[in-house]
């Protein structure tokens, strides 16, 4: 469902930019294009790549590699699936709100400081999605902890990714919640000095990309799996050298 939604948003962007002028987006709601870009980026990263590569492959392959019938907390892992599905619904509800500003998938201030329902729904969806990812990361670390040294390259890569997510997700969540605080509680965490405030919107960028680099690790992990499996079978003696060269 997430992949289909992301592809549809991508097609809308491509059709709209095919030539100059309005094509499929109404001139009465031009801000829909900004909302489209926001939701396309967030859905493809947080609801397609990370659940598919990190959640799907991890839940399937980590128990196989460590010789376990299941991950250590399977019921808790079901909660992460529920949180991810709920966050996707919250994200898609942003399409049904009033005409408003799309802050982009990075949710940078000051664009994200306008007190509109679209931005709030996007932020709440990200926070709920982060909670599901945090639960999955804890599950992975505890499942593979005792057999980490004996496992193949895939398991340490997933565990390292999980540890990075455990440390960086609370930072991103705090930065996003401070945006809501600025919008509705008159705080000045991210309100810049241009408006006479003492906030620091650049600090938000540092906090966001502190997590943003970690979110790319599930993509790298899949490369580790493919290179490790192929090179180990065909080039046993020089496999690690080939893997590093490919990466």
Predicted regions and their residues:
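Membrane-embedded and interfacial regions of multi-pass energy-transducing membrane proteins
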Residues: 1-247
């Amino acid at each position: 469902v997430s992949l289909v939604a992301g592809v549809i948003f991508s097609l809308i962007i491509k059709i709209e930019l095919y030539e100059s002028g309005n094509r499929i987006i109404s001139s009465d709601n031009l801000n829909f294009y900004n909302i489209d870009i926001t939701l396309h980026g967030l859905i493809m990263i947080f609801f397609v790549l990370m659940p598919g590569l990190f959640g799907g492959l991890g839940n399937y392959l980590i128990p196989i590699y460590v010789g376990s019938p299941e991950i250590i907390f399977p019921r808790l892992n079901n909660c992460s699936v529920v949180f991810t599905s709920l966050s996707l619904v919250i994200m898609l509800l942003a399409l049904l709100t009033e005409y408003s500003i799309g802050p982009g998938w990075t949710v940078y201030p000051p664009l994200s400081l306008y007190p509109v329902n679209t931005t709030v729904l996007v932020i709440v969806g990200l926070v709920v999605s982060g909670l599901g990812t945090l639960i999955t990361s804890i599950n992975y670390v505890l499942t593979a902890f005792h057999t980490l040294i004996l496992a193949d390259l895939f398991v340490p890569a997933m565990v390292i990714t999980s540890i990075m997510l455990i440390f960086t997700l609370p930072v991103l969540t705090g930065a996003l919640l401070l945006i809501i605080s600025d919008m509705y509680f008159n705080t000045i965490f991210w309100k810049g000095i241009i408006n006479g405030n003492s906030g620091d919107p650049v600090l938000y960028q540092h906090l966001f990309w502190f997590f943003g680099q970690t979110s790319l690790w599930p993509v790298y992990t899949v490369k580790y799996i493919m290179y490790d499996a192929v090179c180990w079978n065909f080039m046993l003696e020089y496999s690690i050298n080939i893997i590093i060269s490919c990466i």
